[in-house]
């Protein structure tokens, strides 16, 4: 019991850490201008390979990646199809995350990430048969109230919001169901995604010349790869260590950070109505935090 609580606590800390890094990643599309969102996505995938390998080799080694391919996935066509569908899913989400801030879809993406945890929690209950505690139900109801207000206030639902909240949960839940190791899984994902990205970069002569001529890209692009590698591996690892319901509520940290970045960095104005969206979500996070403290005391 004590070991299980230790793993859950570690998963919660990893999830919070990864959500904070996702907030930083959102800024890279702005810092790397005049590169387009698609350019930033392609460079992110290529530089992330090196970041992931820097984590992989000193910790679990290259054999673990080979073991994923030969043993975990093996000769099962079903598992390979499910894995590759997840890879396509992840690739589309990575592209959308970098493309949205520069194409007027920032608010819609934030809405998608607000709905994402709710869909995760419902699917975790329906697909993985995870039970929700009373406190977790209260937290999810609070979060749902905030999201419902935002939907009522904006009265819009774009394709970008729909793509994030309905498609992205499949990636996390399928990997958890298949018991794919987090670091090895995301490394194989990025290797596969980087192949078309490499072809794309080679076809963009203007982008290549810009990156080679401006020294700031020599620092920003490696930083993009390292931050991406750490955030994604930590996030996927945490999703496998904690119940989906807790992971769902903690996932609200990212859209809240995106909101704060929009207000304090991008100078977007906050209205009184916005508080009716964000205060219930903040309260849901506090409720989950209280449950974690209570469970820790019970173990002691």
UniProtKB/Swiss-Prot annotation:
The chain crosses the membrane at residues 13-35, 45-67, 80-102, 106-128, 180-202, 217-236, 243-265, 275-294. InterPro entries: EamA_dom, RarD. It comes from the Bacteria. It holds the Pfam family EamA. GO terms for cellular component: plasma membrane. Keywords: Cell membrane, Membrane, Transmembrane, Transmembrane helix, Transport. Signal peptide: none annotated. It is a multi-pass membrane protein. The keyword Glycoprotein does not apply. Disulfide bonds: none annotated. It is found in: Cell membrane. Belongs to the EamA transporter family. This is Uncharacterized transporter HI_0223. It comes from Haemophilus influenzae (strain ATCC 51907 / DSM 11121 / KW20 / Rd).
């Amino acid at each position: 019991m004590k070991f299980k609580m230790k793993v859950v606590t570690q998963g919660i800390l990893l999830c919070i850490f990864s959500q904070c890094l996702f907030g930083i990643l959102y800024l890279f599309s702005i810092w790397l201008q005049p590169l387009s969102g698609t350019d930033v996505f392609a460079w992110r995938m290529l530089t992330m390979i090196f970041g992931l390998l820097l984590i992989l080799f000193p910790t679990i080694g290259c054999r673990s990646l080979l073991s994923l391919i030969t043993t975990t996935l093996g000769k099962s066509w079903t598992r390979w199809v499910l894995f590759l569908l997840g890879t396509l899913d992840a690739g589309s989400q990575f592209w959308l995350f970098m493309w949205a801030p520069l194409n007027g879809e920032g608010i819609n993406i934030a809405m998608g990430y607000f709905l994402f945890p709710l869909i995760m929690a419902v699917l975790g209950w329906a697909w993985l048969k995870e039970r929700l505690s009373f406190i977790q139900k209260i937290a999810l109801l609070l979060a749902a109230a905030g999201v419902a207000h935002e939907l009522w206030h904006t009265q819009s639902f774009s394709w970008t919001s729909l793509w994030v909240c309905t498609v992205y949960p499949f990636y996390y839940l399928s990997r958890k169901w298949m018991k794919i190791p987090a670091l090895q899984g995301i490394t194989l994902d990025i290797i596969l995604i980087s192949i078309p990205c490499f072809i794309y970069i080679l076809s963009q002569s203007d982008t290549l010349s810009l990156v080679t001529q401006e020294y700031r890209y020599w620092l920003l692009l490696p930083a993009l790869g390292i931050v991406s590698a750490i955030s994604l591996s930590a996030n996927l690892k945490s999703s496998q260590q904690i119940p989906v319901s807790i992971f769902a509520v903690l996932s609200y940290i990212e859209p809240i950070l995106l909101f704060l970045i929009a207000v304090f960095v991008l100078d977007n104005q906050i209205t009184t109505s916005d508080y009716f969206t964000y205060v219930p979500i903040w309260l849901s996070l506090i409720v989950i935090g209280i449950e974690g403290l209570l469970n820790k005391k019970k173990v002691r």
